[in-house]
Amino acid sequence: MTIRKMTELNITEKRILIRSDLNVPIENGIIQSDARILAALPTIELALQKKAKVIIMSHLGRPKEGYYTKKYSLFPIFEYFKKKFNNTKIYFSNNFLDGIKLNPGEIALLENTRFNKGELNNDEQLSKKYSDLCDIFVMDAFGSSHRMQSSTYGIGKFVKIACAGLLLISEIDALKKALKKPKRPMVAIVGGSKVSTKFNVLNKLSKIADTIIVGGGIANTFLAIDYKIGKSLYEPDFVFEAKKLRDKYNIIVPIDSRVGKNFCKNEQAIIKSPDNIKEDEEIMDFGDESIKKIISIITQSQTIMWNGPVGVFEFPNFRKGTEMIAKTIANSNAFSIAGGGDTLSVIDMFNIKNNISYISTGGGAFLEFIEGKKLPAIQMLEENFKNKSK
């Protein structure tokens, strides 16, 4: 992989367009988690230090393309930036496609890219307009790097210089460290509701990790190979595929589970073995014996890759498995990498973000990189380097 890095370029007084990932949860105009903003700051701060003319763009949520929707406006992030960069002139622009004038050391935050018609379909005219805004394009949104859209991919065809920002490089380096030459033993923890969405990830990780621990609805599909699991969430169509994986690789499934009769916050948990689950019961978390076994595996590991909770952690009585796994990873001296939306929510819930070696900002991009897919944004950077270096 040959791409330019922002750190290798002279960006002083240049117009720098940074595609950040500022897709943060906002309720009633208040940012609920600034994790992605904090991850984006080093690239922005470097550009300011170098006295660049800094233009920042991002998407937020899933608005109807081409239409302004207040709920999805980046204005709350503009307010956040004003406090963060209180000694810097910063502008908010919702009418930027015909150009922006900035002085060195100033910032312009652009309105939601998805308000622009053609963004999602990688429209060439829109991509060209983006490219006209800058001298150098910096792709720093790892969380959107699997999207072939105008602001993440199409712009690379027209801009003279496209490069990777600090966050994108750190994401790639951390994932390569875990996937290419991991310290042994390596354990991968894969939770979530569906095997179908993570089958390729499981297949890939099974060839790399020494042990795979499955949780949530994914684990239920593996349990359904041998047991009747009541009304638990699982995918009947993937039981055969799950069996092929289990028979070939070292995949750990729960030996006991916390079950309940109703999917609700205050439901009482009962611990049962998988051969004793009634028709009106559903699995919602690991049992204590499973937790002990998994803690032992994690404690002995030198590399830990974690994607997804292993139970319904939003319900207090079905949180223990996810909580104990999270805290065990946090207390480990192993190299740990965590990614995926729900995983980040767990990390926030238990306040362990400073105890994980690397927290990926990517959800779909995180999984696709693990699968070995070529991410469109990385492909764009490679093609720009190759074509513009001739």
Curated annotation (Swiss-Prot):
Lineage: Bacteria, Pseudomonadati, Pseudomonadota, Gammaproteobacteria, Enterobacterales
Compartment(s): Cytoplasm
Record-listed ATP binding positions: K198, E314, G340, G341, D342, T343
Record-stated family: Belongs to the phosphoglycerate kinase family.
Name of protein: Phosphoglycerate kinase
Molecular-function GO terms, alphabetical: ADP binding; ATP binding; phosphoglycerate kinase activity
Cellular component per GO, a single term: cytosol
Entry superkingdom: Bacteria
GO biological process, alphabetically ordered: gluconeogenesis; glycolytic process
A Pfam family reported for this protein in Swiss-Prot or TrEMBL: PGK
InterPro entries with a match to the protein in the record: Phosphoglycerate_kinase, Phosphoglycerate_kinase_N, Phosphoglycerate_kinase_sf
Binding partners and assembly: Monomer.
Chief place where the protein resides: cytoplasm
Reactions mediated catalytically: (2R)-3-phosphoglycerate + ATP = (2R)-3-phospho-glyceroyl phosphate + ADP
